Structures are given as C-alpha cells and as structure tokens.
Amino acid sequence: MAFQLALDALAPTTHRDPSLHPILESTVDSIRSSIQTYPWSIPKELLPLLNSYGIPTSGLGTSHHPHAAHKTIETFLLCTHWSFQATTPSSVMFMKPSKFNKLAQVNSNFRELKNYRLHPNDSTRYPFTSPDLPVFPTIFMHDALMYYHPSQIMDLFLQKPNLERLYASLVVPPEAHLSDQSFFPKLYTYTTTRHTLHYVPEGHEAGSYNQPSDAHSWLRINSIRLGNHHLSVTILESWGPVHSLLIQRGTPPPDPSLQAPSTPMASDLFRSYQEPRLDVVSFRIPDAIELPQATFLQQPLRDRLVPRAVYNALFTYTRAVRTLRTSDPAAFVRMHSSKPDHDWVTSNAWDNLQTFALLNVPLRPNVVYHVLQSPIASLALYLRQHWRRLTATAVPILSFLTLLQRFLPLPIPLAEVKSITAFRRELYRKKAPHHPLDVFHLQQHLRNHHSAISAVRPASPPHQRLPHALQKAALLLLRPISPLLTATPFFRSEQKSMLPNAELSWTLKRFALPWQASLVLLSLSESSVLLHKLFSPPTLQAQHDTYHRHLHPGSYSLQWERTPLSIPRTTAFLPFTPTTSTAPPDHSEASLPPAFASTSVPRPPPVASSLGAQPPTTTAAPPTPIEPTQRAHQNSDLTLESSTPIEPPPPPIQSSDIPPSAPVLFPEINSPHRFSPKLPTTPDFEPTRTSPPPSTSHQDSTDPADPLMGSHLLHHSLPAPPTHPLQSSQLLPAPLTNDPTAIGPVLPFEELHPRRYPENTATFLTRLRSLPSNHLPQPTLNCLLSAVSDQTKVSEDHLWESLQTILPDSQLRNEEINSLGLSTEHLTALAHLYNFQATIYSDRGPILFGPSDTIKRIDITHTTGPPSHFSPGKRLLGSQPSAKGHPSDSLIRAMKSFKVSGNYLPFSEAHNHPTSISHAKNLVSNMKNGFDGILSLLDVSTGQRTGPTPKDAIIQIDHYLDTNPGKTTPVVHFAGFAGCGKTYPIQQLLKTKLFKDFRVSCPTTELRTEWKTAMELHGSQSWRFNTWESSILKSSRILVIDEIYKMPRGYLDLSILADPALELVIILGDPLQGEYHSQSKDSSNHRLPSETLRLLPYIDMYCWWSYRIPQCIARLFQIHSFNAWQGIIGSVSTPQDQSPVLTNSHASSLTFNSLGYRSCTISSSQGLTFCDPAIIVLDNYTKWLSSANGLVALTRSRSGVQFMGPSSYVGGTNGSSAMFSDAFNNSLIIMDRYFPSLFPQLKLITSPLTTRSPKLNGATPSASPTHRSPNFHLPPHIPLSYDRDFVTVNPTLPDQGPETRLDTHFLPPSRLPLHFDLPPAITPPPISTSVDPPQAKASPVYPGEFFDSLAAFFLPAHDPSTREVLHKDQSSNQFPWFDRPFSLSCQPSSLISAKHAPNHDPTLLPASINKRLRFRPSEAPHQITADDVVLGLQLFHSLCRAYSRQPNITVPFNPELFAECISLNEYAQLSSKTQSTIVANASRSDPDWRHTTVKIFAKAQHKVNDGSIFGSWKACQTLALMHDYVILVLGPVKKYQRIFDNVDRPSHIYSHCGKTPNQLRDWCQEHLTHSTPKIANDYTAFDQSQHGESVVLEALKMKRLNIPSHLIQLHVHLKTNVSTQFGPLTCMRLTGEPGTYDDNTDYNLAVIYSQYDVGSCPIMVSGDDSLIDHPLPTRHDWPSVLKRLHLRFKLELTSHPLFCGYYVGPAGCIRNPLALFCKLMIAVDDDALDDRRLSYLTEFTTGHLLGESLWHLLPETHVQYQSACFDFFCRRCPKHEKMLLDDSTPTLSLLERITSSPRWLTKNAMYLLPAKLRLAITSLSQTQSFPESIEVSHAESELLHYVQ
C-alpha cells in the first residue's frame, strides 16, 4: 500500500517510469509464458472468471477459437493439473494423437494412448481404434467420464487388476439438477430433453454435444461398491463446468470419529472431532440469495435466485423512498436486469424479486432501543412486550392450584377476636384460654409429653393427620425448651387497659373449592392458552427471527452431501471384448490394418454432432456406450485377428448388500447412453435417437467389413427446405377447423345448406353444427338482430339461439364480432332458418340476402358510419335519383366483375375525387419554371417539329386552369405490398375491348419500358405509355397512373383537369414505399400536403402478400409470399456482373454504371423486379435512408439481397440503418414501428379476392385486425396528481418541521431510483420581499429619437434567399419571410438576424454538425496524450495561481457538504422544469440507454447581438441530452466544486455565474478603472477546441478536493467515450453536461493566467467571454503553452468593452441598446410585444437608472438606439410599467401588478425581481425554464459556512 501511494505521488512520467521498471521486468516472463501456453483471444468478460479459477492467462492472446475459454481450461487441465499428477508411467484414453504428443512433451510419463471409436464423429478425431485396454496402473480419461456409468468404470478396474488410479475429466454443469438455466451463460449453456443434456460451449452450436442428463451424479457420489470391491471417488478440482476426478482402488479409510474416545467430556472444546463428518462439496456460482417460497405455492429454486447486491439495494430503496408506487420496484429491477453481470438471472426471478419487494414493503422489525431508563421502566416495558406470554403461562398454573387443594389442603391464617375489654373490665373472652403458643398446640404436647403426630387420633379426618410442614418444624424446635417458656414474662398476664381494647389471634383455616369448579377453571385456562396460540401473533423474539430470516436470507450455496453408491452388477466398459496386450502399441499409421481404422468398431447412437473442420477439444464428445441390440448385431460382424468364437460373457457379479432405499443416482434404464454386455435381445422400447438411423435396405446391402462403411455411416444429408409456398392458413389462426362444436369439412354455406341464394352472398366458409346450443351471451353490437327482430317479430334472444343451431361457435364468438358486430353472413343464416329474403339498402345500392325461393321480404338499412349500423326499414330519400348515371359506371361495373386467374380486382368502390385547383396550379407552375420535370427545358429550336413547344403546352394548361372550375372524377386505387401483383391484373384489364382507350403514366423510363413489353401493343400505340410529364399533354378516356406516390404532389389533380375527356382514373401504388421529392431547391411542391395522407381514404384494401420476394425476406416482414425460392441475405465484397446494384445517390449510381455494372438508385428502382440478388451498397448515407427506401431496397429481387460495404452500417448501432440491420441479422421487421402513423390505418387482406362478397358489418373497423401488434397504442394520460398506485407513504419525523423537499411521486419509475431524496440539513433562507433601493441618480437626458422613424429605415431592402445555404440540395430556412407580417419597415423585422427553428428548418442541425461537433476516428476511446497531460498540468497550476492556491495541497473531503450538494442538485433538477416536462422526458432515464451516449439536438433561438445583426446563415447551437444518471451523479460534484471556488475566488475576479445585473453593476463600479483600452476576448469554436487537456484539468480539480475516485473515473470515462447519433465525439465540451459553465469559465481563467501576469488586475470571466481591465505583460512560458493549445483567440482592444451583452465600465453596466432595439422591432412585427415588453423594460432599466453616467458606457453610434428604446417604452408601456423607470423604490404591490400574468420573462428580468415574486412566477407552467436558478445560487451561498 505504501509503495502504491508513492507511485501515485509521482505524477510526472519521468519519475514514475523508472519506479515501475522493476515491476515490468518481473512480469515479462509470466506474460510471455501465458501467451505461449494460452494463445487464444479470450472474451474480456470471461477473463476475470478464468483468472479466479487460478488459470494464469493474460488475455493478450490473438488466436481465434470458437470456444477459447474452454480451450484454455482444457490446456490448464492437461499441461498443468494432469502433468503434476502423472508421477509414474501412465496411459491416456480418448485424445487426439496430436494433442497427446504435445502432452507427452510436457511430461514423459504419459506413455501410451488408447482410443476407441464409439461414435461416427470419432473417426475425425481418432485415426485408429485400440483393440486392447491400457496397461499402466494409472490412466487419464479425457472428457469421457460423463458418458460412462459407474458400473462400467467398475468393470474397467475388474478387467485390469493392476489399475490403481483413474484420473478423469468431467464436463457437466453442476447446476444441471436445478434447471436448464446456466449460471455462466457466456461460458456455456445447456438444455435438458428427456434423458439428454445438450451442452453448448460459449454459444458455439457446431461444437455442442449431448450427454446423459444424470452425468452430474458423478459429483454426488464418493465411492462405488460392488460386493467386496470398492472404488473411491474424489473431486480434485473444478473450473466451472469442467471437473477433475480421481477414481482409485481400495477400501476407503475409516472415519476419524471411530478412533476418538467413546465417552467425550461435556467440556471438551474439540467435541466435533468425535462426531461423524459429512462429505459436502460446493461449487462456485454467482453471489446470490434465495427468495422465500410464496405462501402455499411451490416455485422452482432457479426462479428464486437473485443477485445479492441487487436484492440489498432494492431492499434499501423501497424503505428509503418517501413515496413508493407499485411500478417503482419493477423500474428498479429493470435498471439492473440488463447488466451483463446479471445475465444468469431468469426473467421469472426478476419478476419474483420485484413482486417480493413490493408485497413486503410494509414489514418492519418490531424492536425498540431503550437504553437510558430506570429498572422500573425496563420492567414495565418487559411486561408490555411479554404480558401475553406471561399470562398464558400463569393462567394454567393458577388454575392447577384449585385442584391442588383437593390433594394437598393448605391452611389459611385468619384473624379471630379472643377478648374485648373496657375500663379494665373484660366484656368478652373466648372459652379456651389464650396462650401465645396455642397456634402451635404446644400446651397439649407439653401435657401429654408426646409428639403431635402421636396425639392424632385414628378417627381424625385425613386433613388433621397431615400437619403443615411449618407446624412440624416449630414443634421440633420448641419442644425441648417448653418448660422454660412458662417462666418467661411472655406468659405473664398484663394489666388491662382503661381504654376499650380487643385482643385478636390468628387461626389456620383450611379451604378447598369443589372439584367441579376446579375442573371448569382448569378447562377455561387451557382454552385460553389454546386461543392465544391460534389467534395471537408470534412472540417478539419469533417475529424478530422470522423477519430477518424472511427478509435477510443468507447467501445461496450450490452444495450437497456426497454419498456412496452400490451397484448390483457391472456393465462392459467397451462394446467389444478387448484383446490382451502387455506393451504399448505403436502409434504410427503404417502399422494399422487397412480396414481396421474404419470398420472394427460398432456404431453407437450419435451423441454429438460437429459440422466444423475443427472438432471441439474440452467439449468434444468422447465415446459413448450403445444399445444392446446394436452392440450385439455389430459384434457379430466384427473382423478381428483372433479367430476365437465369441462366447457369452459370464454372469454379472451380484451385490447382496445394497440397501433397498438407496438413492438412485444412476438409474438402471435402457437409455441411449448405456449398453449391456448381454447377447442380442429384443429391447422393451426403441430408445430416442438424436439423428435418423440408416434405412433397412442400406443396411442389408452394405457389407460391414467394407472399408467405405464408415463414410456411409457418417454421411447424413440435411433436410431440404420446403419447396411449396407458405399457405395463408399458416399465417392466420384457423379456429373453424378446430371448432369442437362443428363436424365435417369446411365448405361454403350454400353447399351445406343448398338453396337459391343471390350471387356471392352465401359463399362464406363454414361447417355443419354438431352440438346443441351452448347459450353464448349476445354480442354487444347486436344491431342486426334488432333490425331482423323488428321486421320478423321474433325476439332477439330467439334469433341468437337459432344461430347457435346452424353456425359453429367460432363464427359466433370471435374478435370480428366483438369489434365489428354481426355481419350479413349471419343474416344469410337467419334468412335460411326463417325462410325470408332481406334487402339491404346501403351506399352500394340495394343488395339481396337470403334464399330467393321465398315470398317473405324484409327491408334493412345499412349506414357506413362510422360506426356502421343496421336499422329496420327502408331508407327514405328526398327525391328519386337520376336515371342517367355517370359515364364511368359501366367501366366500374366491368372492373368489379373482371377476374384474373379466378381472382377479382382488390377494390370495393370507385371514389369520387374532387380536384384541387391549388394543387394543380402549384405543380404546373413548378413545371413551367423548370423546377419539377424537364419538358420546359427541352430545346426544340433545331428540330422540324411544328406547333407549340412543350413549354408552350404547359403554359396553355396553366392558363386553362385559371378560367375553368374543378371537376369530380371517379378514382380506383389499387394498393399493396411490393410485388403483390398490382400491375398484371390492370394490364389484363386494359387488353379488353371496353378499356382500349387508355393511357399509362409512369414515373421513370424503366417502368414505362416494362409496361410496353408486357402489353405487347403495335408500335403505333406506343404513345399510350408515357412518363408523367408527357402524359399530361395527351388525352384518353381512361388514365392509369403507376406508382402514384412517386409522382409530384398535385399530379392527380393536374392530370384530371388537363384532360376534359377523362372519365376514369386508376392509380397504383404503395404508400409505404415513400413519395416524390423534388431535386430542385427552388421548387415549392414540398409545401403541399403529403399525397400518402390525401389518398389514404381511397385505399379500400391493402394486398398483404407478394409474388416477388423470396421466403427469407417474407419471414422478415411476416408476410405470405408465393415465391417458393428460399433466397439469400448475405454480403459480398465486390459486385457481380449480372446482379443489379442499388445505391443511395445518383453519383454512386453513375459511378457503377461507368464501371460496367447495372445500377440505379434505390428510389428509382421502385416498381422494378430483378431476378438476380440485388446488391445494396452501404456508405455514409445508409444511416440516413428512410424506412420507405429501405423497404424498396429489400423487396426488389426474387432471389434476395446482398450487402456490399462496411458491416458497421448494418450493425444495429447509431450509425447504421435500422431496417437493413434487422434484415442482415434475420430479425423481424415490425411494420408498426417503422411506419407508425400510416401502417395501422391500412386495411390488410391476406389473400386474393376469390369472391366479391357484399358482406356488411355492424361497425367500421378502425384498423385491420390482421398483423396488428397488441402493444401498438398510445399510452394513457395519467394525471400528475395520481396517487392510487402508492404502496406506502413514509411520514415526516415530528422534529424535522415542515417538508422542504419537492415532490417526487410524479417521476418516471426508472428515474426515481436515481434520486437520493435527502432532506437538507440547512434551514432554508427566508424569502425576501424587499426590493433593492436604487441609488439616487440624476435622470439621464435623452436626445429625441422616434422609434418608428429609426425602425422604418433600419432594415435594408434585400433578398433573404441570398443569405441562406444549401445542404444536400435543400435550402435552409433561417430567414423566413413568406407570409410573415411586417409593419415597421418594408420587410419582416425577423430578417435582422438568423432564426433557428428546428421544426421549420430540416437542414439546421445537419448543416451545423461539421462546425459544432468534432468526431473521433473510431469507436475506440479518446486517448489522452503526453501533451495533454503536460498542458493540463500547466493549466491547473495557472488556475491555482488565480485562486491563490497551492497545487500540491489537497482539501479533505466533506461528506456532509457533499450530501447537501446532492439535495441541492436534485432540487435544481426538479424545480428547473415543470412536472409535465419531466414526465414527457421519461426516456432520459431509460436503463437501456447507455450513459456514454448523448442525443444531440438543435437549440431553438433567435439570437440577436452585434455579431448576428445583418449577418448571413449561422450554425445553430447544439445541445446534448444526457442520461439522467449522469446529471444526478456528477451534478453534485460540480456544485461541490463551485462552493469552494466561491470561497477562494479573489475579489478582483468576477464570474457571472448566478449573478444578477445589479451585482454586475456593483462590481463594475467597485473594481473597474478608467484606464483604456480594455482587453475583451472571445474564442472561435471554444467548446470544440478543448481536447484531452481539459479532461486532465478537470480531473486534477476534483483530486484537489479529494472527490471520491469512482466519480473521477466516471467523469474521465464519459469524456473519453462519449458517442452520439452522428458518431463518436472527441472529449470536447458539450452544452448540457454537468458543470459546462463552470468548467468553461475555469478553462478560460486558466488560459488568461497562463498568458498574462495578472496580479491584482480586475478580470471578468463568463464561459468563453472575458474582459481584462487594462493591458498586462505576457508570461515568459506562454509560448510553450500556446503551441499546445487549440484555441483561436478574438482579442479586441476597446474603450467600450462588451461583456455578456452589457457595456461595462466604472460607471456600471448597461444593456446593449442596439440588440435591444432589434428585439423590440422583432417583437412588434411578430405581434408578441405584450409577452416580451416587461422583460425588455427590466433589462433597459439596468442602465437607465445609472443616470447621466450611462452615456460614458455607450459608443456614440449606439446613442440613438438607446434614445429610441426610451421613446418606445414611453409610448408603448402602460403607466404602472413606466414606474420602473423612476428612481423611487417600487412597492411590492406594484411589482405584483406588473408581473400578474407573465408569459415570457428573460433570465435577467427574473433576476431583478424579489424572491417572492420569482417563486410565484416560476410556479406558472407557461413561463420558460432557466438552467440556473437564483434560489439554487442563493442556497449555494448558504453552504459556505461548511468551508469557512
């Protein structure tokens, strides 16, 4: 420890490096050895675990391995552990020869290797099979013990009498007996199926293998016994799932307790040594505790194990919070459940933990601690606590005494009157003479000279024969001296008194209750004890013990007692009889028989599978036993050198001393992992196989001795993928087919109940009813039953019961009926039952339902709503409709009846589209100007064409729109998923005679070419296929617009208005695939509303299937595809010649085209179909792709997609495409998430329309019930005052006074655990209601200046568009002028300076990124360089010089002050924003949000200062949204530092943090001098210019105050690892991080003191702004500092310095009148003067109240603006506001009137108000939030006494 402290003191690297050199030298050899022995690259999360096992791996390896940790454990087992155990020549079994050779090089005692092929995979590991058993007395079995039964190990020892020790490695999770959940899931996982445990090492599925599920029983036995044969089992070591066991021969040693003395002494301190000891083993698991079982419930143990640290933290949290809600424990658990360290905890365990914590919150220990109290008080407390127990104990005893009187009568002494005397005269005397000893009957004994016992007569009663013990004792004592007693004065008679006197005596009386009463009392007492036990709570001690046992359980330990195992018989170790061998065999392959290596070993059922070329090492599957039938069958075909016939084996050895109740650790069953040495027998059952066996024909035709037999056995083909498409029934549930109330096949209703029905009304599918009615309740939406009941006079209940006799229950109770009500299908069934026909009058016209062969008729009206509704009777109309229909009616009827491949067109009705003249005029205007389209730009002057040019035609259309009204045209919309077949049915429709007069409009030439090819028309008809521009110039009866959403907005309206002959429009498109965006920055087409929302009501059906995409893509979207090809989703490094390339930009597309590849942009590929896999190019623009473009790219090809480019763009990070990442990782693409506002409104259909059913429902669906996420809904609004979910509310202690903490009950559950919610220790300062009296000054004299006159000519006339910039071909919008009001000058006053409005300027943040952010080159943390350390030290020394501090002196940490800072920080966070704002930002405390990730957004502001007035485009200020954890943890650190800075700061240094304008004025008047010039400085990109030296400076500042080290490390980690949605950032300053202002101010002050010899010169600093009173000399070391700085200075020598928007000088400070004048102009034109006037007035009064001296502060150029502002306030302010310009002190009532209804107040205006008014104003929700609260600053000043 002392050496470590010395190292920490050596800060300079020149001193530290030599000190560390010996340490480095001592570690070189160990690191080199570790890298050579364990060269594998181990995951960093597993490295600490391996080191804790004692494995010396450094983690610096570079070789990759699929399960590197297992490989490391295996290497340690072989080369270290086993090598140490192999002290004599030994044999090794089940190991690859190459690995054995390396092992033999480590230790030469490893002499021979024996391998046995018992599994097909063994042929890849073992080149040969050993025919005999090992010969050495020590054997090492490598990873095979889990496949062997103890009876087989016993057989091995019996076959090899010289075998003494068997070292075996066992790979089995010790927790396998608990559940299938691993305690170390990163190291291994496993599952148990029946009797098989499937083990997966480190997620490597190819290296997984199977083993018996009872293999873990090897860890539960300590010996194996068979008759007189004993084997001891010892666990030598465990490394997680790998265990080293030693099985050795011999009788186990006797228990030491048998050798101890037989009669130990009671006081023996070593008494436990003489008791039998248990053989207990334990295994390492994560630190966990076991939750108690729920009352009367059984929960699995694995689901009750939770991390101890989380449990303790949650226990403390639930009792520390003031108000606990039901959701708070769950939110606390969520914070920890996502941590990697807790991945072993099951979801049920997390659920049980939060439930356990929630339900046990009210429990508290019933204890008291009374120390300083009297014994009487302690006794009273004891009686109060234990009176029930004492009473319950005393009552039976007292009741028993009543019975004791019957058996042991006790005399009771009673007083008796013997004589009464008065005036010395005896009035009464008892007959018997009085004697003092009469009570003892001594006179009788003296006269008789016998004892009292002999004087008792035989006839005396029993109670007289038993004198009392006291009486007997007195007789024995007094009898020897009785003669002397008579002579004493005691027996002399005394002289009687004159006064009345009574003489009393004591007489013993015997008393006993009747035995009946005694029994009653005894029974009552016993009953009271019983009732006390049943109804009274446990005793205090029991409550205390139960509370701590229930709520503070101990750590869970995975341990058990090992027991001996007795086996009845042995089982053969090998499936064949081994030969006898005395010498190790030769391992060379030349000595092997040709056929032996592959055919001499039988094939057991497969236990493991390995598809990789590299077989597993530690996890490899060793040989496993096989079934009896297989072994016997294969043994009959063995070809061995010995010709001795195989004889039946001897009978197994039986054990007669097996206890009948012994635990069955290894069950004797015919499992696939065991075998028996018996001859072939018929098994009782077929064991479970992990892979299909070979066919019978193959076995019969294969010679077992064939050398190729092994390869045949090892060849198993994988199952082929299904070639048939996924049926639609697999997408949706089919309750009808599984309905138990139905019978028979699914058929149309008209076939099951044949009658004459109107067409397509009885074609719905159903089944025959098989069961009687179940009396289902009527649906809520039963308007159809009411309408039918009103017409037929049959009750609704009877109608409903009738439906239950003909339709199955699944068609009467489902989601459709619950949400939409009954439909016309049910009406058809009722019409059949009651023999009537119904006419439905709907928007589609009259429709008939029911059989036509009936004479009964009813009328029902259907209204579409919403909601839809059935009502009885016929709809009444005001007039008959016109007999003449629309010209397009015949076309629409033909479309409704048209079929393609037996399917109808997917639409319901044609919708009348009223054209919009404004939309059409917008588009034609942009076409005319060349902003959209190219027709107006075509040069036709050189051609021979006559007539108007295209531009002239467009102009004519423009003129035509000016004089012609709009019209209404029928529109039919076909919409569906990509590749659903929207185009093909329309192409077939257009080939019919009725639709021959058509034309097609396409967005691209590629799509037009596809139409031409598909229609196959004559060349003269090619004019019918057009691009979207040329189509407008042509005319036809029918217009088909393909990909309508890729057309400009307003195109539908323009096409209809431009063609008077047009009768019908058919539009095709998918609203999910995006819409048109103009490439011209001057186009105004984007100002029109989106066509996706405008055309959405025309979508009757959305086809949710595809004929194009392959199955792999269909699974992503969860959609049915008719394309049977599986397809691919992969990646390529270079494009293929035949594959189309899809790019993000036109430039990339042109590049690939020039390189010889077929390429187009993703957007332009919409509508195209590719046969080859589409190659998607990934580049920097991929992350900006919209969801629509991502959908287009993934659905273009019939074969799949391949990504080309950096994999980071599909890695699921901030810089990748979310949809591409889901596709690349085979994750489901949830459409509701990518299209939240559009997809839920689409009415999906999942299969083509085979019938055009006129089905009507009783309600209108709000969204299709198909493919809807159940969680897709808006969260309910919960009032902020909601308290019904409170579980507990802890009261405030009486001595604490009123509660000063703010409410936290409204905080999001994920944020509440981050609050300490500590009560402040300091008393809150009283709220001041006084106003600072102004100093008496002479009123300033203003030159006359009319505000309106100056404002009229202030703004020069200019074109605002010239001040905008282009970003990615899109213009910025910082100078909006269109439709903006103006009254002061010729243009809106808002054009004075740039306005940052992120909501109206999409380019604001993207265009500002390069200027405001600095990015790291990679995701790696920012590296602190040596220059950063040196510069940081220099700045720290300069900062200490500024504060007159010693750099080497540290300040002790003050915990009490830091606790106050925590409370203050939480107060600031809760009071700076409204409760609604905090709740709306609940995502800031999301546990899934990494604390190193910040969200960058643009600050909305209209900044007006000298630098922005009349300026051009300006980059916005970026704000960083950090996790609440960062703000609440590091915020107190900054406040803690600020308190010490306020104490140490010299008076000549001014920091503007938390200061009011009046304080600024006072300081200037006190410190600034009249010397000129003054040095004002500002920096360019100050935040971005701070690099690693700022982190070093901040860390040194915190170390000086001894801030806890973990907080310093957190700060450094955040600064060096910060990342955003745009990429990783350097350690630049972020506006929004804790202490931004303080750190910037300190950095600025440190730079100033590094540059100048300041001395006592007045200095003003505020962030990056600074002011020095007069020029100063430069320090000698400034050049060395300057060369390391990255700052860019903007020094200014001026006589009128500007600081924080105020002109300052010895006279005080005054607000910049030029900026204030501009703000007033903007407020007037924005019509916001009433909201802002008060703020501007209070800022103006700061300088106005200086009097005549204010003119010394202003430049001459600003005098007119100061006068104009004064003129403005005098003319525009009401009288009570003008009083603020007076020198007199404003009264509180006046200020209350002024601020009665504020809506907008600046920070400076708030500073000038009293505290009472500030608190009243901040309580109003409409006021803005301030990052710096005056109350917080005032509270900080109250904490200064801690450091004084």
Swiss-Prot record:
Keywords: ATP-binding, Host-virus interaction, Hydrolase, Methyltransferase, Modulation of host ubiquitin pathway by viral deubiquitinase, Modulation of host ubiquitin pathway by virus, Multifunctional enzyme, Nucleotide-binding, Nucleotidyltransferase, Protease, RNA-directed RNA polymerase, Thiol protease, Transferase, Viral RNA replication
Ranges spanned by the short sequence motif GPP flap, renumbered to the chain: 865-867
Residues in Alphavirus-like MT domain copies: 58-219
Pfam family, one: Viral_helicase1
Domain RdRp catalytic span(s) in chain numbering: 1572-1678
Record: active site: 783 (for protease activity), 869 (for protease activity)
Domain OTU: 728-879
Family listed: Belongs to the Tymoviridae non-structural replication polyprotein family.
Protein name: Non-structural replication polyprotein
Organism: Turnip yellow mosaic virus (isolate Australia)
